[in-house]
Design a protein with these regions (language model features):
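Conserved RecA-like P-loop NTPase helicase motor core
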Residues: 28, 514-636
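Walker A/P-loop
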Residues: 165-190
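Conserved helicase ATPase motor motifs in RecA-like P-loop NTPase domains
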Residues: 176-180, 309-311, 324-345
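Interdomain helical connector at the RecA1-RecA2 junction of SF1/SF2 helicase-like NTPases
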Residues: 343-485, 499
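Long, largely alpha-helical accessory region at the distal end of helicase-like NTP-driven motors
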Residues: 120, 124-141, 423-450, 454-457, ...
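SF2 helicase catalytic motif II
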Residues: 272-274, 291-332
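Non-catalytic accessory segments flanking enzymatic or RNA/DNA-binding domains
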Residues: 1-147, 800
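Conserved Walker A/P-loop ATP-binding site and its immediately adjacent core
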Residues: 184-189, 193-227, 273-274, 489-496
Length: 836
């Protein structure tokens, strides 16, 4: 196996000697390995083009002549042009073109014109190429949405403008669209086509304000759009917080007054963090801010929620959204991983575009679109490589623990460690034992790794050269491929400690500039400083006197894992998370490296995920496949009962387009098939049952139970008799394929409220809950709490339970209470109890 990061574009011009194509030339491009493109022999480039074209269905049996071919890399290997640039420049020069074919788009189902040829000469094309290289090519002009974007826009506009008998219908829509879909541009186009006068954009990433502002200009301030608005006496405006982008146009109150007066079209940008602080929704702001309330009280035509999976269903987010909802307000939620939102929408209210659809479209276009420029060509393919750490390192960090944990492997010494050891010394009567504790205390260095030797060996392993090693830095060639990478770690102190080791390491210190973006541990990059620091070091910033770094490693424990793009990153190293890590968080993180880029004049074609917890990677991939089926299956939404066949089909499609490979201690392993992934997950079925206390609903799925062998059935029965049942129905599934996972420190947190009742009717107040904070949300620091308080008794025989989950740092609203247990008189009915 070898790693591929970039490929080169070869532009070709061909002719077909028949009446239909007389006087016409086809311009296209293919991607080839860089060493082929570097050939200076034109005939070799022509052979490479033919090898690609002859394999395409539409070229079978076609006799053609290649008139011209060249590699599109130019300007000292720093830039490359595309076939699309040539098309646009030819059209700007009024060179006529002719469309000779039809193409049925699999996304929209629409038949469109295709197979574009130009009535020009080779000299015209060479002249255009020369202009492009001189920076005189045609600009991008009006935005042309890709087929899937056009369908998302069309379906959403149609839904919002449709009349429903049910007054609650037609008001909410969800885009389950992967990162890099273009949700901002497409969402703003919805606002434009619907003719909304007032649009509110809510984001959990205030730093992306500039991106929204730029996209606003592309939709609302093009010459054509402005001419149309001015003819109607309207002026489009973009505002944020108090001021408009043009301060002379006024503040929020002035802008909204002008909207109400029919003078302006307003797109207003605000962060969810800003709104939920308001006292108006029970927030913790010290001084009342009237602007927050004014924003929430305004009657918005259209509300777009960016990164909607991040806390929109948490209590604070719900309170904000409830204030924003008015009778005629339409709400569009945007997310690449809305796994926690899918059950809130019907199938007709969701548009889905995932990685599998994207990569299929990329392949389908090349095979069926007659060589026209591929709009998906820039989107890299992902590969996930799961590494099992060397046994030597695992054993050293595990010691007496049952499983390997990143949290333990990267654990740093704290003041608490010193205090605990000192207590042991003070209370130890045995002189020899006391001396051992004192020796251990002498080793303690605050904020340094407990297992520093093991981590240094791990770093050595990453760079250790051998003929079989596939660790990403184990050869000079690999280090060139992975010049800029993103490393995800368990916490701030762990990132700081690793930064110090990397700066001292023989290879990493000499070659790589280390960027610690962990900050204070907050996932938010409120002012964009972390992203700016990364980009400044990768690209250089003369104003800040920061030189360009050819090789960087960015360390983080959560910051920069969602909503941002660093095109130069070619790999992410995952050293945080567990089988409990939500698939949404995992996919958000790994897709940071899929941003398209031109690197040294070559197109970024592939990107990589190096995951050192194979169980977590497989679980996340399988869960993503499950959610993809769930999002597109009405029956699945209602019953949450997905067939194994459909899940396996989608998983097979995913790993075909995003290969998942297993590496045994850094050396070549094997590709996982969909069947193998599901087999591994099935092998831990009993373990999951034990961990969930038999309260996992999927354990009682007839389809699952039918697949158990007689031995597995007996094992399940034996363990159930031994452990009994526990109230953990809402706890996440914990799938551990091997002992290379993370520990409970990163497990999902859940809390409960209990209601005891004399009858099967839910009482109005809970019988016991944890303490409540100033906002009326339960806390978990109640020292007198015990499980006895949530047990049904003869006087109150019925127990109801409600739960809340910690999602992205915020507690969700408590679920509707359900009847959980009923008191039984075991002494009276001993035989029945024994039978049960």
């Amino acid at each position: 196996m070898r790693y591929t990061i970039t490929q080169s574009r070869l532009l070709y011009v061909l002719s077909i000697n028949d009446r239909k194509h007389q006087g016409l030339l086809k311009i296209g491009e293919v991607f080839v390995d860089n060493d082929i493109a570097d050939s200076k022999i034109r005939q070799e480039l022509g052979k490479a083009v033919r090898a690609v074209l002859d394999a395409r269905p539409y070229m079978q049996g076609v006799s053609y002549h290649i008139e011209y071919v060249e590699c599109t890399t130019y300007d000292q290997d720093s830039k490359c042009y595309k076939a699309d640039d040539v098309y646009r420049t030819l059209r700007a020069m009024d060179i006529p073109s002719k469309t000779l074919g039809k193409y049925k788009d699999p996304t929209t189902g629409q038949t469109e014109d295709a197979d574009i040829w130009f009535a020009c000469t080779i000299f015209d094309i060479q002249d255009v190429i020369s202009k492009i290289k001189q920076g005189k090519g045609a600009g991008h002009g009006a935005i042309k949405f890709r087929p899937e974007q056009e369908k998302a826009i069309h379906d959403t506009v149609e839904y919002f403008q449709k009349e429903f008998k049910d007054p609650n219908k037609g008001k909410h829509y969800l885009w389950n669209a992967k990162m890099r879909f273009g949700k901002t541009l497409s969402g703003l186009e919805v606002a434009k086509r619907c003719g909304y006068r007032s649009t509110l954009i809510i984001t959990h990433r205030p730093v992306v304000d500039k991106g929204w502002h730029d996209d606003f200009a592309k939709i609302f301030r093009t010459p054509e759009a402005l001419a149309d608005y001015h003819a109607k006496g309207l002026e489009p405006a973009y505002g944020r917080r108090m001021m408009d982008d043009n301060d002379s146009q006024g503040d929020f109150y002035t802008l909204t007054n002008e909207v109400d007066a029919g003078k302006k079209i307003l797109v207003f940008f605000v962060s969810m963090q800003y709104l939920r602080l308001s006292q108006f929704v029970g927030g913790k702001e010290r001084n009342f801010d009237p602007l927050k309330r004014a924003i929430m009280e305004y009657d918005w035509d259209f509300v777009m929620v960016d990164e909607a999976h991040e806390g929109i269903d948490a209590a604070a987010g719900v309170r904000v959204m409830n204030k924003l909802k008015k009778e005629n307000t339409r709400i569009l939620s945007l997310s690449g991983t809305p796994f926690n939102l899918l059950d809130k929408y019907e199938e007709s209210e969701i548009y889905t575009w995932d990685y599998v659809m994207e990569q299929r479209a990329k392949l389908f276009w090349d095979e069926h679109h007659y060589g026209d420029p591929n709009p998906y060509a820039d989107l890299p393919r992902m590969q996930i490589l799961t590494f099992t750490l060397p046994k030597m390192l695992r054993d050293q960090a595990i010691q007496n623990n049952e499983v390997f944990k990143f949290h333990e492997f990267f654990r740093v010494y704290t003041e608490e460690d010193k205090l605990q050891l000192q207590k042991l010394i003070d209370n130890e009567p045995n002189v020899i034992k006391k001396a051992e504790y004192q020796a251990e205390l002498a080793k303690v260095k605050i904020d340094k790794f407990v297992h520093e030797k093991a981590i240094n060996r791990f770093l050595d392993k990453l760079v250790e050269e051998s003929d079989t090693s596939l660790y990403p830095f184990s050869s000079d060639v690999f280090r060139e491929h992975f010049r800029h990478t993103f490393w995800l770690l368990p916490g701030v102190k762990e990132a700081a400690a690793l930064e110090q080791l990397l700066r001292k390491h023989e290879v990493f210190s000499e070659m790589f500039h280390i960027i610690n973006a962990a900050g204070d541990g907050n996932i938010e990059d409120k002012n964009g400083s972390a992203l700016a620091d990364v980009l400044d070091n990768i690209r250089g910033n003369a104003k800040k006197n920061i030189t360009k770094k050819d090789y960087t490693i960015t360390l983080s424990c959560g910051k920069l894992t969602t909503g941002v793009s660093v095109p130069e990153w070619t790999a992410v190293l995952c050293m945080k998370g567990s089988e409990n890590t939500p698939a949404a968080n995992y996919m958000q993180t790994i897709f940071r490296v899929q941003t398209h880029a031109v690197l040294e004049g070559r197109q970024k074609s592939d990107c990589y995920v190096f995951d050192f917890a194979p169980d977590r990677a497989l679980t996340a991939v399988a869960e993503t496949a499950k959610m993809a089926v769930y999002a597109q299956t009405e029956k699945g939404k209602k019953q949450m009962k997905l067939t194994k066949k459909k899940e396996e089909e989608h998983l097979a499609a995913f790993i075909k387009l995003c290969p998942v490979l297993s590496m045994d201690e850094g050396e070549m392993g094997k590709h996982f098939s969909a069947t193998q992934i599901f087999e591994k997950l099935s092998n831990v079925y009993i373990e999951r049952a034990v961990r969930s206390g038999y309260a996992d609903n999927s354990l009682y799925n007839p389809d699952q139970l039918m697949n158990l062998s007689p031995e597995q059935e007996k094992a399940l029965g034996d363990v159930h008799d031994l452990l009994g049942s526990m109230p953990n129905a809402w706890k996440p599934e914990k799938i551990n394929v091997n002992k290379n996972g993370l520990g409970d420190a990163d497990a999902e947190q859940i809390k409960y409220i209990y209601y005891l009742s004399k009858s099967e009717v839910l009482p109005p107040r809970p019988s016991m809950a944890a303490k409540f904070d100033d906002n009326g949300m339960p806390t978990t620091e109640d020292e007198v709490w015990s499980d006895v308080m949530c047990a049904p008794v003869e006087l109150f025989p019925y127990l109801f339970v409600s739960h809340s989950q910690l999602v992205n740092g915020e507690w969700s609203s408590f679920s509707n209470p359900v009847l959980w247990k009923k008191w039984e008189n075991k002494e009276k009915d001993d035989k029945t109890a024994e039978a049960k």
